[in-house]
Amino acid sequence: MAFRIDKLTTQAQNVVAEAQAQATSAGNAEIDPLHVLSAAVNQRDGITTPLLEKINVDVPKLKSLLTSELEKLPHASGMGQARVSAKLQAALEASATSAESLKDEYVSTEHLLVGLARTDNKAKNLLSLLGVSDNDLLTAMSQIRGSARVTDPNAESTYQALEKFGIDLTQLAQSGKLDPVIGRDNEIRRVIQVLSRRTKNNPVLIGQPGVGKTAIAEGLALRIFEGDVPQSLKGKKVVSLDMGALVAGAKFRGDFEERLKSVLREVKDSDGKVILFIDELHLVVGAGNAEGSADAANLLKPELARGALRCIGATTLDEYRQHIEKDAALERRFQPVFVGEPNVEDTVAILRGLKPRYESHHGVRITDSALVAAANLSDRYIADRFLPDKAIDLIDEAASRLAMEKESVPEPIDRLQRRLRQLELVHRQLVDEQEASAVDKRVEVEEEMESAKAELASLKEQWETEKMGLDDVQSVRQEVDQLQHRFAQLDADAKEKQLRGESPEDAYSEMLQVQSRLRELQARIDEAEKHDDSADQTKEEPGDEKRRLLRKEVTEEEIAEVVSTWTGVPVTRMMETERAKLLVMEERLHQRVVGQDEAVTAVSDAVRRSRSGLQDPNRPIGSFLFLGPTGVGKTELCKALAEVMFDDESAMVRIDMSEFMERHSVSRLIGAPPGYVGYEEGGKLTEAVRRRPYAVILLDEMEKAHPDVFNVLLQVLDDGRLTDGQGRTVNFTNTVVVMTSNVGSQVIQRVTEEGGGEDEMRQAVEDALKARFLPEFLNRIDDTVIFHPLQQTQIRRIVQLQLEELRSRLAANGLSFEITDAAIDQIAEVGYDPAYGARPLKRVIQREVQNPLASAILKNSYAEGTTIKIDHDGDQFVFSG
């Protein structure tokens, strides 16, 4: 029969074209069957190599034989285009006959191989040498293709679809690449029950991100591998569908559907041996959808309904509602299995099960207290994620930090190396100097360099020794991990043999050997850890400064460090220096805030309660309403608090409530609702706290805001939480909420001038508050703090504080100043106004001190290093220097 080139599939055409290119470049006059076989074997992503491997052909050996045979073919330079040889023509016709006998519409690559094996040529001789016949090829073809026929030019892309577009979880379980699944027994049992149904045997796992939906599918694969499943599921495979691979490269309409159909066909042809797992099930709805074509969900529906396809889906609650529930026909084919978030106790159990894997991977020891801390701290401080995922991430990152210290230079060595480089730079510049001072300095630098080099050498030696021990323990842990997996494999084999009525003696014999080796390795690990512990205790004795450079175990302190890095909340154990700072917090605040003892004490007590762990975990650290006249230190106390807590006064969320005078402006705090402009941007308050959960929140000038704004704050003050416009819950439990107001300031001023008592003032202020704010708002505030008008003595102290700021600015110009008591008294007297507080002082200092000094500096009146004396002679300020 005549052979038609247009009846070749795309891949087969590529093979023939490549064979022609090989023949032409080698100077062969004809395209030989050897060229075609060589092109087929070397084709990337082709069907030839898997086909030959199926019948146990040594493909590398075949390639080397082909190379040597091709070199023997006659060749000459200057040859034109190579033509098809008579033997290749016969082979092509035989391949067309093979396709026709199998009812295929196109000649695919495997038909070319059959044609080569059926006709008399050198390619057949090579295949025969390796024990390959045309019948072997046909048998392997039927195994790879299944019931599929070649009906289009891209048929090869649909072969072995499950291997190309799926990940065999059961195979991963067998090779020990899946983490153990702890707990979740009820959910796995429910999944098995649904899978065992006759029809609609398709469970869908629904739960929040990170609760372990995919882990349940992996747990099922592990149970199948271990034989811990009902008889109906024994020997089955769980294959995870890779939607990315399925969609990638599907250029033309219908490509995606063709691939999916081939996957479904292979699952059906397996006679129930394959359970399909579709992670992110919502991606299937609409996948491949285009005008006039069916999406993946519509291809799945008939198979799901008939029970011909067993499928496990996994998706989140939101995605299930948005995508699956909308399609009622798809929804009814799936049986929901809800996967809830585990509690802290269950999370600790999960972490204990995963602990050996992470110890083996990172080469560090993880203490049990670290696992408990990871579960507790992640539950309390990481509000926008779910257990156990966030707790596992904490353990992983803390362990990776310690593992990284082995690879990178420890901090003491790094610090010494940098210091040594600085000294070498100074030394190079002093080498040629002859001045006595320079010579002395050079000798001093040389001595310091020698000392630093000696210390560096000692530290490097210690680091290498410690690192060597760590590497040894890590390799032992990895061997333990492998042996434990081997033990599980042998156990599963023994159970399988017992079920078949065979003797499992061989398996039990090897299990005893593995168990013995495991005991040896565990003893080595215990001995190494005991040695490390005793070494650590010896090194930490008083007076011995040599400490470990590399930490070998993850403790709760390392977990707390990671939480602090993620959230900014200081949950690490307090050092003695921090304890001392907190105990004298009032003194530190009074360095900036003059007077106002009641306010300073209230704020300090709240912070101490929080850091000592006695704070209610469901409320903010503290919520205060600061009342008093303008300029008495309300905002300044907030800045001082931020500086004490974060070493940065700008580390606070400051919101001017005068911007929220209209009723609708409340949406700016929490974000616009859906459908309004700005919905995606989030709220001014909620976004600030999401980014910095540990903060001082200052709501300035509260009485200027619309009363409806206070309603938003009720949940913040009572429950420490607020839901923004996008439905996300923002955690305020690690914030200090301070509201300032001038309500009652006239009353405070009047009572102070009249010499009234504290009780009279508080009662008058409370009456003014009740008239302005809602009772439910006032009732949720921890403390209402009254700021008293400043006295003359306090004003004098504020003058000194503000002059200290001026002193630091003058120091940049190489100048300093001394100021007399007369000058300070004059500034305090001129700048004191009970109605305006301390703010006029800045204007007086600016006018009377800064302006004359600025003019003098511009005129070069004072040489660098001059100390300027500032006095007041009764009429004006006098500057001399």
Swiss-Prot record:
Pfam families: AAA, AAA_2, AAA_lid_9, Clp_N, ClpB_D2-small. GO terms for molecular function: ATP binding; ATP hydrolysis activity. Residues 160-341 are annotated as: NBD1. The keyword Ion transport does not apply. InterPro entries: AAA+_ATPase, ATPase_AAA_core, Chaperonin_ClpB, Clp_ATPase_C, Clp_N_dom_sf, Clp_R_dom, ClpA/B, ClpA/B_CS1. CDD domains: AAA (cd00009), RecA-like_ClpB_Hsp104-like (cd19499). It is found in: Cytoplasm. GO terms for cellular component: cytoplasm. ATP 1 binds at residues 207-214. Its main location: cytoplasm. The keyword Oxidoreductase does not apply. Residues 342-568 are annotated as: Linker. SUPFAM superfamilies: Double Clp-N motif, P-loop containing nucleoside triphosphate hydrolases. Residues 790-881 are annotated as: C-terminal. ATP 2 binds at residues 628-635. Residues 8-73 are annotated as: Repeat 1. PROSITE patterns: CLP_R (PS51903), CLPAB_1 (PS00870), CLPAB_2 (PS00871). One of its GO terms (biological process) is cellular response to heat. Residues 578-789 are annotated as: NBD2. The Clp repeat (R) domain probably functions as a substrate-discriminating domain, recruiting aggregated proteins to the ClpB hexamer and/or stabilizing bound proteins. The NBD2 domain is responsible for oligomerization, whereas the NBD1 domain stabilizes the hexamer probably in an ATP-dependent manner. The movement of the coiled-coil domain is essential for ClpB ability to rescue proteins from an aggregated state, probably by pulling apart large aggregated proteins, which are bound between the coiled-coils motifs of adjacent ClpB subunits in the functional hexamer. Belongs to the ClpA/ClpB family. Part of a stress-induced multi-chaperone system, it is involved in the recovery of the cell from heat-induced damage, in cooperation with DnaK, DnaJ and GrpE. Acts before DnaK, in the processing of protein aggregates. Protein binding stimulates the ATPase activity; ATP hydrolysis unfolds the denatured protein aggregates, which probably helps expose new hydrophobic binding sites on the surface of ClpB-bound aggregates, contributing to the solubilization and refolding of denatured protein aggregates by DnaK. This is Chaperone protein ClpB.
